[in-house]
């Protein structure tokens, strides 16, 4: 094996840094194999000051980078920025590409999905025969669809028809059903008024007959 090359002492132009492999904690730069201090002008205080200066510059550059990112995010016209920010020791930190936040969705309406309750023919949901017979109507052939209690509750006792909200009922069928119900109401009203008029006429005729008989007997 060859002899190791002697280590040359650093000159004044060499940077003082804790990263220097020849730096020792005994206030000197010592060459390998030599215990005598070399370069007495070199002191650890200068090295520490240089290291602190580098750390301060790095911290300042990091703060500038964070400020740039925050300002870029807060701006709506940021776009793609690749600004280079200088850092000590010849290093360069490129700002990450920042994009403006996506605009909030405006004008979106909530869609409500209505699900129809499935009817079952189980023994618990079936209507008793007596209840079914009590609600069946033969007026205009309108017979309620009997099945579950929910369907029985939707049955309109006044019109005698089953009120269905299913998709099978079109607009024309709905209008026809409402028209039949209105016609039945008007017919019932006309019948009631006719009966009331007949009763009133009969009562007036009876009263007039009684009064006429009384006056005829008085003035004989």
Curated annotation (Swiss-Prot):
<dbReference type="GO" id="GO:0019031">
    <property type="term" value="C:viral envelope"/>
</dbReference>
<keyword id="KW-0946">Virion</keyword>
<dbReference type="Pfam" id="PF06072">
    <property type="entry name" value="Herpes_US9"/>
</dbReference>
<dbReference type="GO" id="GO:0016020">
    <property type="term" value="C:membrane"/>
</dbReference>
<dbReference type="GO" id="GO:0075733">
    <property type="term" value="P:intracellular transport of virus"/>
</dbReference>
<keyword id="KW-0735">Signal-anchor</keyword>
<dbReference type="GO" id="GO:0044171">
    <property type="term" value="C:host cell smooth endoplasmic reticulum membrane"/>
</dbReference>
<dbReference type="GO" id="GO:0044178">
    <property type="term" value="C:host cell Golgi membrane"/>
</dbReference>
<feature type="modified residue" description="Phosphoserine; by host CK2">
    <location>
        <position position="166"/>
    </location>
</feature>
<keyword id="KW-1032">Host cell membrane</keyword>
<keyword id="KW-1038">Host endoplasmic reticulum</keyword>
<feature type="transmembrane region" description="Helical; Signal-anchor for type II membrane protein">
    <location>
        <begin position="195"/>
        <end position="215"/>
    </location>
</feature>
<feature type="topological domain" description="Virion surface">
    <location>
        <begin position="216"/>
        <end position="220"/>
    </location>
</feature>
<keyword id="KW-0812">Transmembrane</keyword>
<dbReference type="InterPro" id="IPR009278">
    <property type="entry name" value="Herpes_US9"/>
</dbReference>
<keyword id="KW-0597">Phosphoprotein</keyword>
<keyword id="KW-0472">Membrane</keyword>
<dbReference type="GO" id="GO:0043657">
    <property type="term" value="C:host cell"/>
</dbReference>
<feature type="modified residue" description="Phosphoserine; by host CK2">
    <location>
        <position position="164"/>
    </location>
</feature>
<keyword id="KW-0261">Viral envelope protein</keyword>
<keyword id="KW-1040">Host Golgi apparatus</keyword>
<dbReference type="GO" id="GO:0055036">
    <property type="term" value="C:virion membrane"/>
</dbReference>
<comment type="similarity">
    <text>Belongs to the alphaherpesvirinae envelope protein US9 family.</text>
</comment>
<protein>
    <recommendedName>
        <fullName>Envelope protein US9 homolog</fullName>
    </recommendedName>
</protein>
<feature type="topological domain" description="Intravirion">
    <location>
        <begin position="1"/>
        <end position="194"/>
    </location>
</feature>
<feature type="short sequence motif" description="Di-leucine internalization motif">
    <location>
        <begin position="145"/>
        <end position="146"/>
    </location>
</feature>
<comment type="function">
    <text>Essential for the anterograde spread of the infection throughout the host nervous system. Together with the gE/gI heterodimer, US9 is involved in the sorting and transport of viral structural components toward axon tips.</text>
</comment>
<keyword id="KW-1133">Transmembrane helix</keyword>
<dbReference type="GO" id="GO:0020002">
    <property type="term" value="C:host cell plasma membrane"/>
</dbReference>
<keyword id="KW-1043">Host membrane</keyword>
<feature type="region of interest" description="Acidic">
    <location>
        <begin position="151"/>
        <end position="169"/>
    </location>
</feature>
